[in-house]
């Protein structure tokens, strides 16, 4: 699977991530020039979580993001539909659950906060996933979506697109266990909605108070919202 225009069949997407799991964390750090660590810290800060709270880290992959969230003192569970990714993070001692973002294996209103980092773009039905996140979050609970976005500076945006389509696949061939998956990555980023459009989608799924801020010049955006009362 290497084209962003395909139907994002959950089995195909899970298989793709199973194929990159072994070197996934290293590849991400190399391709992001180390910015992935900063993005994880920013996500934890935006959630505003603390001891005694329950947090769902959706599309958690190898659970490196969950470990960062754990630094808050909250109880955090990693969920992903790629069993291979969860297995690659077996050494990270956090609870792990295999599950589809559009059919989460959790009861209603159980989490104080939910976050998804670089995973919403890969879900077959974005609105269904956002509604499921709202379902499992208590009223007043928080959502943070960390996702690739659109650089705010036009010149920077042009340079970034060139990096995505030309340099990124070449670097991936050198460090990734499945370079074709990163061709899909580049194309899916280009096809993804910008900051305002994603904010509209989040609000349309029932979340309130949607706002965003850019990281790394808009390469990544953090969208935050809260679950309104019933």
Swiss-Prot record:
Q: Which GO MF term does the entry hold, naming one?
A: demethylmenaquinone methyltransferase activity
Amino-acid positions noted as binding S-adenosyl-L-methionine in the UniProt annotation, renumbered to this chain:
62, 80, 100-101, 117
PROSITE patterns noted in UniProt? SAM_MT_UBIE, UBIE_1, UBIE_2
GO BP annotations, alphabetical order: menaquinone biosynthetic process; methylation
Read off the CDD domains from this record: AdoMet_MTases (cd02440)
Q: Which InterPro entries match?
A: SAM-dependent_MTases_sf, UbiE/COQ5_MeTrFase, UbiE/COQ5_MeTrFase_CS
Write out the catalysed reaction: a 2-demethylmenaquinol + S-adenosyl-L-methionine = a menaquinol + S-adenosyl-L-homocysteine + H(+)
State its Enzyme Commission number(s): 2.1.1.163
Q: What does UniProt give as the signal peptide span?
A: none
Q: In which pathway does it act?
A: Quinol/quinone metabolism; menaquinone biosynthesis; menaquinol from 1,4-dihydroxy-2-naphthoate: step 2/2
Keywords annotated in UniProt: Menaquinone biosynthesis, Methyltransferase, S-adenosyl-L-methionine, Transferase
Q: Which HAMAP family match?
A: MenG_UbiE_methyltr (MF_01813)
**Which protein family is it in?**
Belongs to the class I-like SAM-binding methyltransferase superfamily. MenG/UbiE family.
Role summary: Methyltransferase required for the conversion of demethylmenaquinol (DMKH2) to menaquinol (MKH2).
Which PANTHER family does the annotation name? 2-METHOXY-6-POLYPRENYL-1,4-BENZOQUINOL METHYLASE, MITOCHONDRIAL, METHYLTRANSFERASE
Q: What is this protein called?
A: Demethylmenaquinone methyltransferase
The lineage is: Bacteria, Bacillati, Actinomycetota, Actinomycetes, Mycobacteriales
The gene for this chain is menG
């Amino acid at each position: 699977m290497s084209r962003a225009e395909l139907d994002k069949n959950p089995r195909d997407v899970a298989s793709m991530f199973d194929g990159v799991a072994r070197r996934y964390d290293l590849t991400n750090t190399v391709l992001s020039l180390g910015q992935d660590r900063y993005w994880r810290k920013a996500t934890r800060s935006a959630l505003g979580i603390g001891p005694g709270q329950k947090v769902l880290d959706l599309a958690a992959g190898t659970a490196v993001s969950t470990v960062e969230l754990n630094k808050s003192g909250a109880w955090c569970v990693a969920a992903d539909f790629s069993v291979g990714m969860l297995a690659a993070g077996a050494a990270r001692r956090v609870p792990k659950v295999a599950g589809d973002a559009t059919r989460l294996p959790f009861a209603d209103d159980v989490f104080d906060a939910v976050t998804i980092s670089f995973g919403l773009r890969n879900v077959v039905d974005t609105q269904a996933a956002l509604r499921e996140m709202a379902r499992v979050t208590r009223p007043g609970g928080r959502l943070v979506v960390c996702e690739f976005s659109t650089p705010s500076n036009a010149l920077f945006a042009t340079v970034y697109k060139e990096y995505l389509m030309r340099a990124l696949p070449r670097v991936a061939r050198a460090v990734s266990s499945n370079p074709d998956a990163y061709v899909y990555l580049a194309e899916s980023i280009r096809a993804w909605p910008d900051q305002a459009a994603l904010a509209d989608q989040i609000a349309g799924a029932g979340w309130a108070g949607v706002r965003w801020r850019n990281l790394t010049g808009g390469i990544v955006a953090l969208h935050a919202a809260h679950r309104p009362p019933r």
